UniProtKB/Swiss-Prot annotation:
The keyword Secreted applies. It is found in: Secreted. GO terms for cellular component: extracellular region. The keyword Zinc does not apply. Belongs to the non-disulfide-bridged peptide (NDBP) superfamily. Long chain multifunctional peptide (group 2) family. Expressed by the venom gland. It comes from Lychas mucronatus. This is Bradykinin-potentiating peptide 25.12. Inhibits angiotensin-converting enzyme (ACE), but does not serve as substrate for the enzyme. Potentiates bradykinin (BK) on the isolated guinea pig ileum as well as the isolated rat uterus for contraction. Also potentiates in vivo the depressor effect of BK on arterial blood pressure in the normotensive anesthetized rat.
C-alpha cells in the first residue's frame, strides 16, 4: 500500500475512535467498534500507519534517504559533438 493511504487509514481510525467515545448516541455500537479497534487487522493498520508516519517525519526532518552510489547505473562517457560548418 501507498504510504499516504496508510496515513489516511490511520488518521480515520483515530478520528472514528474519538467520535465514538465523545457521543452518547453510539453507546450500543461502542462495544462493537471497540472489538473492531482491537482486531488484528486494525492493529496491523495502526502499526503500518505509525511506521509510515515516523518514516515521513524522518524524511521531512533529515531529507529523503539517498540511494548508495554503487547501486546507481554507471554514467556513459560524454559523446563528442561534431562542429557544424556555417
Amino acid at each position: 500500500m501507498n504510504k499516504r493511504v496508510l496515513l489516511v487509514i490511520f488518521f480515520v481510525t483515530l478520528l472514528i475512535a474519538d467520535e465514538v467515545n465523545s457521543f452518547s448516541f453510539f453507546r450500543k455500537a461502542k462495544g462493537f467498534l471497540k472489538k473492531i479497534w482491537k482486531s488484528k487487522i486494525a492493529r496491523r493498520l495502526r502499526e503500518k500507519g505509525m511506521k509510515a508516519l515516523k518514516n515521513y517525519a524522518n524524511d521531512v526532518i533529515n531529507g529523503p534517504a539517498e540511494a548508495p552510489a554503487a547501486a546507481a547505473a554507471p554514467e556513459e562517457p560524454p559523446v563528442e559533438q561534431r562542429r557544424r560548418r556555417r
